[in-house]
Curated annotation (Swiss-Prot):
Modified residue annotations for Isoleucine amide: 84
Domain of life: Eukaryota
Protein name: Mu-theraphotoxin-Hhn1b 2
InterPro entries hit by this protein: Huwentoxin-1, Huwentoxin_CS1
Positions of the pro-segment in this chain: 22-49
Length: 86
C-alpha cells in the first residue's frame, strides 16, 4: 500500500515537471518567434522618423517609441508596443 502510494505521488511529480518544462519551452519559443518576426533590419532603414512605430526594435533605457500613439518600449521583448490601461 505504501509503495503504491509512493509510486503514484512520484508519477504525479514527474508529470508536473514534464508539463512545466513543456510550457516553459513553448513560451520561450513564442517569444523568440515574435521577436524575430518584428526585428528591425538595420540595412533597410528608409526614412528616419522622430519616433519608432509599433513593432519596431527599441532600447528601454532610451524609449523612442511614438508617445502620440500610446506606444512604449517593452523591457521584456525590446520592441514598441501599445500601452494598455492608460
Amino acid at each position: 500500500m505504501k509503495a503504491s502510494m509512493f509510486l503514484a505521488l512520484a508519477g504525479l511529480d514527474l508529470l508536473f515537471v514534464v508539463c512545466y518544462a513543456s510550457e516553459s519551452e513553448e513560451k520561450e519559443f513564442s517569444n523568440e518567434l515574435l521577436s524575430s518576426v518584428l526585428a528591425v533590419d538595420d540595412n533597410s532603414k528608409g526614412e528616419e522618423r522622430e519616433c519608432l512605430g509599433f513593432g519596431k526594435g527599441c532600447n528601454p533605457s532610451n524609449d523612442q517609441c511614438c508617445k502620440s500613439s500610446n506606444l512604449v518600449c517593452s523591457r521584456k521583448h525590446r520592441w514598441c508596443k501599445y500601452e494598455i490601461g492608460k
